[in-house]
């Protein structure tokens, strides 16, 4: 949007190569996206629907963290994407960090498959089937100085061990499978992750958590800083998880992304849940969700 509003001419560079320059008036959104990704994208948000589980996979009651979270309640189901919307500082990331055991909580209960759990650290969260793709992939999601091979196994190293030793054959086979299925552009599984583009780094993070065999996948700003083509590939991963019956939670500051991919949306403000909106609700639109994010009440 900023390009069309501010620029006189637009140049597209893809994979380090010059593609095309045109006057802005000669571009439209579709042609620009096609030039950026090298192929036509018929649907920017390829939403697919899974079978909603009968009971919530994750249930949170009265979650509290001093000065940050004030009685957060929500339910997340298998076979669905639960979107979290809100302004910066609304408490969305803080809620997920608390559930994941990255930050201590002062009160509240967390249930997974109907059983109350006490999660004090990320390892306990992983053992309880939670995967957390953080918004800071470089600082918290990856070891940039290490290879793709190493990063892919970090969430579940036991899966790749024979006794006390790593099974290198299994690591390579799994890594090559993820490179192919996630379309990671790399010359080798031994490429240093820090040398990859942002979109390919994000795919490595996703591959790492797919190896964790989780039931609950938390995506925090999953498409921030990646190109349009890579975004669609991330959405397709979410779709495959949903169709496999997994519980997917997506935090996003992009309203079209929230509306395009979510089955339900939790709206937060100031560490509290202001509204929960189903996809078939009359309030499932940008205006009403933003109204709730600003503290307004949704009637009916």
Where do the protein language model's features map onto the residues?
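Glycine-rich phosphate-binding loops of nucleotide-dependent enzymes
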Residues: 1-300
């Amino acid at each position: 949007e900023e390009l069309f509003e501010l620029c006189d001419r637009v140049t597209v560079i893809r994979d380090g190569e010059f593609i095309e320059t045109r006057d802005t008036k000669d571009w439209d959104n579709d042609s620009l996206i096609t030039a950026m990704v090298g192929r036509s994208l018929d649907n920017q948000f390829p939403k697919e629907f899974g079978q909603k589980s009968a009971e919530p996979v994750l249930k949170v009651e009265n979650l509290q963290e001093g000065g940050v979270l004030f009685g957060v309640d929500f339910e997340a189901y298998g076979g669905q994407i639960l979107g979290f919307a809100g302004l910066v500082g609304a408490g969305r990331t803080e809620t997920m960090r608390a559930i994941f055991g990255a930050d201590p909580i002062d009160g509240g209960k967390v249930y997974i498959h109907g059983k109350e759990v006490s999660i004090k650290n990320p390892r306990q969260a992983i053992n309880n089937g939670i995967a957390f793709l953080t918004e800071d992939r470089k600082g918290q999601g990856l070891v940039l100085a290490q290879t793709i091979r190493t990063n892919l196994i970090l969430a579940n190293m036991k899966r790749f061990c024979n006794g006390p030793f790593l099974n290198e054959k299994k690591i390579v086979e799994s890594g090559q499978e993820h490179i192919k299925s996630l379309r990671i552009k790399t010359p080798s599984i031994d490429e240093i992750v820090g040398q990859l583009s942002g979109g390919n780094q994000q795919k490595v993070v996703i591959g790492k958590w797919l190896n964790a065999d989780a039931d609950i996948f938390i995506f925090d700003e999953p498409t921030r800083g990646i190109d349009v083509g890579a975004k669609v590939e991330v959405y397709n991963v979410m779709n495959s998880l949903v169709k496999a019956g997994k519980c997917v939670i997506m935090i996003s500051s992009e309203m079209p992304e929230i509306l395009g991919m979510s089955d339900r949306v939790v709206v937060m403000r100031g560490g509290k849940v202001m509204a929960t909106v189903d996809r078939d609700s009359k309030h499932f639109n940008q205006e009403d969700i933003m109204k709730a994010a600003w503290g307004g009440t949704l009637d009916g």
